[in-house]
């Protein structure tokens, strides 16, 4: 019984708790699939899509976002010192041979409890796997985690992701 208690405390300390200096209120991800509002309090993802009539509609996707996923994104944010980045940080793909200009953006917006925001944007032409051409090794893990989470949400709600060309 004593060992189970020790393992439980270790689990809480290392895996399920948020970072000590956590002041992130919510996380918003914008990409070609839509806009995903991720929040621990809401536990749902809201997605905006353009309709044929050029209106921006909000569609509630019935998908639970686990605290584990959000805490992992927060942990990557703080462990890689991304709070030291400027409030609007843009990255371009390392794909210099592309015939297409960078046209698809994946943007992560962090909303903080003090009302501030931080935008991290990655521009790429969208062909093949964009994460293979990611320029900054320090920021890449957070984009990998967000890409996996949005892919999981889209696939589980019946909206299959497009096959890379």
Residue ranges and their predicted role:
Residues 25-44:
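Post-signal peptide N-terminal segment of mature Sec-exported envelope proteins
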Residues 19-28, 92-165:
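Short, well-ordered, aromatic-rich surface patches in folded extracellular/luminal domains
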Residues 38-41, 56-65, 116-126:
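Short amphipathic beta-strand/extended segments with alternating polar/hydrophobic composition
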Residues 15-16:
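C-terminal motif of bacterial Sec signal peptides marking the signal peptidase cleavage site
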Residues 1-5:
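Positively charged n-region of N-terminal signal peptides that target proteins for export
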Residues 42-50, 102:
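A short, structured beta-strand/loop element
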Residues 52-86:
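A short-motif feature that recognizes glycine-rich, charge-decorated loops
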């Amino acid at each position: 019984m004593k060992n189970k208690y020790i393992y439980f405390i270790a689990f809480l300390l290392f895996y399920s708790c948020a970072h000590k200096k956590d002041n992130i209120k919510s996380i918003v991800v914008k990409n070609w699939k839509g806009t995903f509002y991720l929040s621990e309090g809401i536990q749902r993802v809201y997605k905006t899509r353009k309709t044929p009539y050029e209106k921006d509609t909000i569609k509630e996707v019935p998908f639970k976002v686990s605290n584990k996923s959000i805490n992992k994104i927060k942990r990557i944010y703080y462990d890689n010192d991304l709070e030291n980045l400027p409030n609007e940080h843009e990255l371009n793909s390392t794909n210099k041979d592309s015939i297409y200009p960078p046209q698809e953006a994946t943007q992560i917006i962090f909303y903080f409890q003090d009302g501030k925001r931080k935008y991290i944007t990655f521009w790429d032409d969208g062909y093949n796997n964009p994460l293979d051409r990611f320029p900054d090794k320090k920021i890449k893990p957070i984009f990998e985690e967000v890409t996996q989470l949005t892919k999981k949400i889209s696939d589980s709600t019946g909206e299959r992701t497009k096959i890379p060309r």
